[in-house]
Amino acid sequence: MQGDPMPDQILQFTHPPVPRQPPVKPSSPLTWPDDALNRPFLKERLDEFQRWLADAFDAGETAEILVDARTLYIDQLLRQLWHYHGLAHAPHTALVAVGGYGRGELHPLSDIDVLVLSQAPLTPPQQQHISELLTLLWDLKLEVGHSVRSIAECLEEGRADLTVATNLIESRLICGDLALFLTLQKQVFSDDFWPSRAFFPAKLAEQQERHSRYHGTSYNLEPDIKSSPGGLRDIHTLLWVAHRHFGATSMDEMVGFGFITRAERDELNECQSFLWRTRFALHLVLNRYDNRLLFDRQQNVAQLLRYQGEGNLPVERMMKDFFRVTRRVSELNQMLLQLFDEAILALAPDEKPQPLDDEFQLRGNLIDLRDETLFSRQPEAILLLFWQMVRNRHIEGIYSATLRQLRYARRHLKAPLCTSPEARTLFMRILHQPGAVKHALLPMHRHSVLWAYMPQWSNIVGQMQFDLFHAYTVDEHTIRVLLKLESFADESQRPYHPLCVELFPRLSQRHLLLVAALFHDIAKGRGGDHSQLGARDVLEFAALHDLPAEDAQLVAWLVESHLVMSVTAQRRDIQEPDVLVQFAGEMQSESRLHYLLCLTVADICATNETLWNSWKQSLLRELFFATEKQLRRGIHVSPDVRERVRHNRRQSLVLLRMEGIDEQRLQEIWSRCRADYFLRHTPNQLAWHARHMVLHDHDEPLVLISPQATRGGTEIFIHNQDRPYLFAAVTGELDRRNLSVHDAQIFTNRDGMAMDTFVVLEPDGSPLSPDRHPVIRQALLQILLPGDYRHPRVRRPSSKLRHFNVDTSVVFLPSPTERRSYLELTALDQPGLLARVSEVFVDLGISLHGARISTIGERVEDLFILADGDRRALSRAMQAEVRRRLTEALNPNDKV
C-alpha cells in the first residue's frame, strides 16, 4: 500500500531557485526631477522596473518582497505625479489606494485602484489636473481604476454596494489630507456602516456565489488563481471579515485575537506564498491582466517556477502543488469562517448541544466532539465521526472546534488509519450505507481523511493530466464518479440515465461498485497500465479488509476492465459477430455486465461535463442489449448474420407495405444492395431510405437528413453515383460547417451507386439544429454535382490545440474476417482530418466501408474499416504503406 503518509504535507515538487546575484534595483520615483517627468522618460522607467521585477524573481527573490516593492514603487510614482500636477496643495483632498492596491498586493499586472477623496466638489482646475494625471497613467499602460467621491458619497455608495464597502475597509492613504482620510476611516468602521452582523453573512453569500461559478471546486484544470475555490479570494475573505470585526489587518493580529492558532497562521502564510508566487509568475508571462492558469500558460509558468521533469511532468507537478494548496485553503476557510460565525452570530443561550451518543453531539446541524481529546487518544474514532454523518442525514457539516481537532489528529498520525481493525470495520460499514458517498466519502475527501485512511489515495490528490479531455484532477474525478453512481439510486435521474437507474438498485453488492470506483484510477500518474496496477492495489485492499474471494475478484475485474465497455462501444465494430462474442466473453455474466455498465456511464459523466451525450448513451445501450442477448444465447455461439439480414428486410417491408410502397420498384433497388447494407441498418432506417429512393430519380443525388434524432445524433443519408474522394468531399464539407461526424457506414451497390450514412452532432454534442437542415442539405447536394475533386476548405484550428502534441499512431487490429481490415488511428484533432485520411485511402486504391469517430479532448481515436480493390483485407505491405502515408499526412514531423 504505497503512498505519501503525510496527509498534511502541502507542497511536494517545488524546487528552490539557484541563488545568484540579484539585479540592481531601479531608482525611486521620488528621486526623479520634475523636468524629467515626461511620458517617454516615465515609460522607460516603468519598463525598466518591470524588467527588474522579472530578473529579481528569476534570481530567487520572493513574491512577497517583489509585490511590496511594486506597491511602494507605484505609491512613490503617484505621490510624485500628484505633486507634479499641482494637487499636493489642494485643500481637503487625498489620494487613497483601495482594493488590492489598498492591501498592498500589486503583482506585475495588477490593477491600480485609487479613490480621489475630496471634502468639497472639485474645482474645474482640480478636475483638469486629475484628468491629466489619469490620462498620463493610462498612456503609460497602467491599468488604473479611479473614482472621485466625498466622504458622504463613499458611505452612500458603500452601503449600496458590498464591493465598494470592502474596498473602503482596506483603503490606505497614499498622499494628501490625513485628517480627511482618518475621518473616512472612522465612518467606515462605525457600527452603522456594514456592522459585522451584516457584513459577515454578505461576504459569505458572495463567496458561495463565486464558488458556484466554478462548480464548487478548485479542481478545474484551468483554474483562476484568485477566484477559484481555495484561491486568493478565499484568503481575502478571511482577512476582510477579521478586519471588519476585530480590526485585525494581518494574520499575526488574528493570532493575537485568539481566532487562529500559530500553526494555522503558518499554514495560511505558506499557502498564500505559493499562490502569490504562482500568480507573480503568471503575470510575468502575460501582456494583459489575467489570473487564469490556462493550458497555453501552464508550461511557461512551470518553467519560471523551476519545476523539473520530462514532457508534461513539470506542468503536472506544478498543478499538483496548486491543487493541494487550494484544498488546504478551502478547509481553513471553512473552519475559520465558521469560527467567525460563532463569534459574530452566536447561538442563543438556550440552543444547547444535543447528544448523539457517548462521543458526539449536535450543535445546530453540525457534529461536535463531546471530548476534544478523543481523536488524539483513539485515531480510529475519526471514522466514527463519518459513520455518524452517514447515519444522521440532517448533519450538514463538522463543528469548527471538532474540525480543528481532526486536523490536529490527522497531522500527528503515526500510521495510516486502515492499519486499525476498528477503522477498517467502520469504513466497510460506511460503504454499505445508502448515501455513503455524499454524507461520508465526500467530506472524508474534503478533509483529507481518505488520504489518511488509504495511502494509495495520496498519489492522486491534485493529480492532473495535461490534456483537453479530463476536466478535473484524478481525485476529484473519482469522487464525481462515486457521486454519479450514488445518483443512480435516485428516481429523478431516470430521464437522464434510464438504464442505470433501472439496474443500480438491483445490484446485490453496491458497496463493491463503490470500492471499484475508488480504485479505478488510483494508479494514474505512476507509469504503466493504470488499470492493471489499480487491480493489484484493490486486491491488497480486499485482503486487508477481509473481503470474500469472489468479491475481491469482482472489484479487481471491474478496475482492470473499467475502460473495456467504453472502448468497445465507441471504437469497435460491434456489428461484427466476433467482436460481440469477444466482448461477451470478457463479461462472462449478465451480473458483471450490469456492474460494468453503471461504472462506465459514471466514469464518462465524471470525466468532463460535455462528454456525455445521447450519442454515447445510444452506443452503450446498443452494446449492452446486444451483449445481454449474446450471453443468454451462449457466450461462444455466434449470431446468425443471415437471419439478421432476413429479419431486417422483412420488418422494413412490413412498414413500407403499410404505406403502399411500390414493391416492384423497391425490389429493384434492394436487389442491387449488398447484405452488409441490411445488416448494419435497422428496419426503420431501411424503410426511411427506401420510401425516398423509390420516388427519386436514380441518376440524381439524394440527400436525406433525419427529422428526429437517430441513435443520439442526426443521420444523413446520401445516395449518389460513387466516385473517388466522395467520402473526403462529404466529411470535409460537414467539418467546414462545424459538424462532428461520429459514425459512417459506406456502401457501394452492385450498380456502382454509393449509399452512405453519417451520424453527425453539433459541437455541443446535440443533434443537428432543425433550422440548419436546409442549408446543410443544399451544401451537400452542391458538392455531389459532377466535377473534379477539390480539397475542402478547412476551419481555423482551435487556439488551444496549438499547445498539445499527440503522436500519430496507426495500428491494424486483429481482423475477424479475411474481407476487411480494421485500422485504429490516434492523432491530434485538426480540421479536415477525415478528408485528409480519406484522400490517402483513395490514392492507395483502398475502399472505406465504415468509420467510428471518437474525439477525446485534443486527440482523435478513430476506427476505419477497409478493403483493397479486390474487396479483401489489406496485405502487410499495404498496411505499412498506409501507416507511412497517414503519418506524413497528419503530422509531417512524425517518422514511422
UniProtKB/Swiss-Prot annotation:
Explain what switches its activity on or off, per the activity regulation comment. Answer: Uridylyltransferase (UTase) activity is inhibited by glutamine, while glutamine activates uridylyl-removing (UR) activity.
Q: Which UniProt keywords apply?
A: Hydrolase, Magnesium, Multifunctional enzyme, Nucleotidyltransferase, Repeat, Transferase
Encoding gene per record: glnD
Briefly, what is this protein's role?
A: Modifies, by uridylylation and deuridylylation, the PII regulatory proteins (GlnB and homologs), in response to the nitrogen status of the cell that GlnD senses through the glutamine level. Under low glutamine levels, catalyzes the conversion of the PII proteins and UTP to PII-UMP and PPi, while under higher glutamine levels, GlnD hydrolyzes PII-UMP to PII and UMP (deuridylylation). Thus, controls uridylylation state and activity of the PII proteins, and plays an important role in the regulation of nitrogen assimilation and metabolism.
Q: In this protein, which residues make up the domain named HD?
A: 474-596
Q: Which organism is it from?
A: Sodalis glossinidius (strain morsitans)
Cofactor(s) needed? Mg(2+)
- What does the record give as the reaction this protein catalyses? [protein-PII]-L-tyrosine + UTP = [protein-PII]-uridylyl-L-tyrosine + diphosphate; [protein-PII]-uridylyl-L-tyrosine + H2O = [protein-PII]-L-tyrosine + UMP + H(+)
Q: Which residues form the ACT domain?
A: 715-796, 822-896
- Extract the InterPro entries matched here: ACT-like_dom_sf, ACT_dom, HD/PDEase_dom, HD_domain, NT_sf, PII_UdlTrfase/GS_AdlTrfase, Polymerase_NTP_transf_dom, UTase/UR
GO MF term set: [protein-PII] uridylyltransferase activity; phosphoric diester hydrolase activity
- In this chain, the stretch annotated as Uridylyltransferase covers 1-355
Stretches the record annotates as Disordered:
1-31
EC number(s) of the enzyme? 2.7.7.59, 3.1.4.-
GO term, biological process aspect, one = regulation of nitrogen utilization
What is the protein name given in its UniProt record?
Bifunctional uridylyltransferase/uridylyl-removing enzyme
Which family is this protein grouped under?
Belongs to the GlnD family.
From the UniProt record, list the coiled-coil ranges.
none
**Quick one: where's region Uridylyl-removing?**
356-714
Domain remark text: Has four distinct domains: an N-terminal nucleotidyltransferase (NT) domain responsible for UTase activity, a central HD domain that encodes UR activity, and two C-terminal ACT domains that seem to have a role in glutamine sensing.
State the NCBIfam families in the record: PRK01759.1, PRK05007.1, UTase_glnD
What Pfam families does its record include? ACT (PF01842), GlnD_UR_UTase (PF08335), HD (PF01966), NTP_transf_2 (PF01909)
* Compositionally biased intervals (Pro residues): 16-26
